[in-house]
Each structure stands twice: as structure tokens, then as C-alpha cells.
Amino acid sequence: MISAKEAREISKKNKEILTEVAIVEVLPEIEELIKKNIDLGNDGMDWEAKEHSKYVYAIRDTLKEYGYTVTAKFNQTDGHYLSIYW
């Protein structure tokens, strides 16, 4: 497990964040949400955009409650993965 600070530094260099390790450490109460939905495209299921959006918004809104400014989006060029920036 890396720290949220280390994840933010990596995200600055790579333009994407190590989402699972960073957010689970900062917000353990949403660990199950992340584990269930972080790799939505890897199970071969065809998720609709609105399905992606509700998880992005759920994570974003939870982070905002803790005072983070958050941008969350899915990148669908290399499969579906969630990138969250703060």
C-alpha cells in the first residue's frame, strides 16, 4: 500500500492516479465500492455510460464530503478504467 501523497506524486508524473491504493487508504469506508467497480471493463461485461457515471459520481461525491476537489472520469481507449484526480 502506498500513501495518498505518493499516489498524487505518481499521478502528476503519469497523468493518472493509482486510484485503488490511494483512495482505499484515504477513505476505507468506500473500499468495497472501489473493489467492485474499479475495473468495470475487465470482466467482459458491456456497461452503459450511465452505469459508469453513477460509480464515478458516487466516489466523487464521497470524496467531496471529505473536502477533496475531485475530477473523476473513465478512459475507454484502453478498456474501462477509472482515473480520479485531486
Regions picked out by a protein language model, each given a short descriptive name:
Residues 37-74:
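Acidic, low-complexity, intrinsically disordered interaction modules
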Residues 1-51:
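An N-terminal amphipathic alpha-helical segment
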